[in-house]
Amino acid sequence: MKRLIIAAIATTLTVPAFAAANDAIDKAAKEKGAVKTASGMVYRSIKNGRGKSPSASSTVEVNYRGTLTNGKEFDSSYKRNQSIKFPLSGVIPCWTEGVQMMKVGGKAKLVCPPELAYGTRGAGQDVPPNATLIFEVELLDIK
């Protein structure tokens, strides 16, 4: 019986988080030019790039800003004044998928549902479990 009560409490606490995540995804998908992919991510080009797009095995250089749905910024390469380089195969699935949709010089908004971001584990103190994340990503180069 005690386990049933604990499970009911846990379910009650997580349902609002999932509802908020769905609301943010649905709202983003309605923005002009936005595309909701089969995985559930929403992609919207802010600035079109030129040239080629990276593949899932590419190493890319980007600038980015990450926020929660309440607008709280949790990370920014712009604030550090330093772009980052990484293999697309080594980041959250939302980035692997979304950055492949970009061309060098482009800038896009990625709205990442929890299952394509950090899921139930969250990330450190700034990204809670089951958080929908919003990234503004600028693709600088493909290595």
Residue ranges and their predicted role:
Residues 2-143:
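Cross-family detector of peptidyl-prolyl cis-trans isomerase
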